[in-house]
Amino acid sequence: MGQKINPTGFRLSVLKNWSSRWYTNTKKFSDFLNEDISVRQYLQKKLAHASVGSIIIERPSKNAKITIHTSRPGVVIGKKGEDIEILRRNVEKLMNVPVHINIEEIRKPEIDAQLIAASITQQLEKRIMFRRAMKRAIQNAMRLGAQGIKIMSSGRLNGIEIARTEWYREGRVPLHTLRAEVDYGTSEARTTYGIIGVKVWVFKGEQLGIKERQN
């Protein structure tokens, strides 16, 4: 099962936490979910060049707190905080509640799965050979402390007629072990030959579960 399932969803409540952290009654659930999707799409579009790894949305009583994990916090904040204030006002219009935006820096973007996937897709769109992009990402991740990494690319690689899938792995990536901290990210490269999908798994070591850490 660990081979097929999303590694993040597989470890929810054991090692990982949800990216949307709120609870509501049945009537409002679909509205809140649509708001979350709209906010994420807006932020990902506006911060496309800010190397955003993840977006956490929390909803305390009648307001919202959004945490943006990025390797380039200066790009998100902008000169004298102007850009982040514009973001906050626009997100408030989408959510219809007061919003607080918090920025957290990703210290090692080379071992963040989502940023690795985004970096590879950017290189593919610039017509860089997919093997070179994948191998370079693997070397950087292993050099900066990853215990294992696996990268998979699918589509018309190098413009070939028949789509295929290629993957590279270095180190170990235990997909069945629940206590294994496996970071997972996906991205799509829009090339002249069509879309190329990229998936990245990064194994950062084994950890105690959420409940064990609390005890």
From Swiss-Prot:
Keyword check for Lipoprotein: no
Disulfide-bond pairs as recorded: none
Keywords: Ribonucleoprotein, Ribosomal protein, RNA-binding, rRNA-binding
UniProt-listed Gene3D superfamilies: 3.30.300.20, Ribosomal protein S3, C-terminal domain (3.30.1140.32)
Name under which the protein is recorded: Small ribosomal subunit protein uS3
Function: Binds the lower part of the 30S subunit head. Binds mRNA in the 70S ribosome, positioning it for translation.
Coiled-coil blocks: none
GO biological process: translation
Assembly mode: Part of the 30S ribosomal subunit. Forms a tight complex with proteins S10 and S14.
Domain KH type-2: 39-107
Domain of life: Bacteria
UniProt gene name: rpsC
Keyword Ribonucleoprotein attributed: yes
A GO CC term assigned to this protein in UniProt: cytosolic small ribosomal subunit
SMART domains, alphabetized: KH (SM00322)
Organism: Nitrosomonas europaea (strain ATCC 19718 / CIP 103999 / KCTC 2705 / NBRC 14298)
UniProt xrefs under InterPro entries: KH_dom, KH_dom-like_a/b, KH_dom_type_2, KH_sf_prok-type, Ribosomal_S3_C_sf, Ribosomal_uS3_bac-typ, Ribosomal_uS3_C, Ribosomal_uS3_CS
Molecular functions per Gene Ontology: mRNA binding; rRNA binding; structural constituent of ribosome
Family classification: Belongs to the universal ribosomal protein uS3 family.
PANTHER family to which the protein is assigned, alphabetical: 30S/40S RIBOSOMAL PROTEIN S3, SMALL RIBOSOMAL SUBUNIT PROTEIN US3C
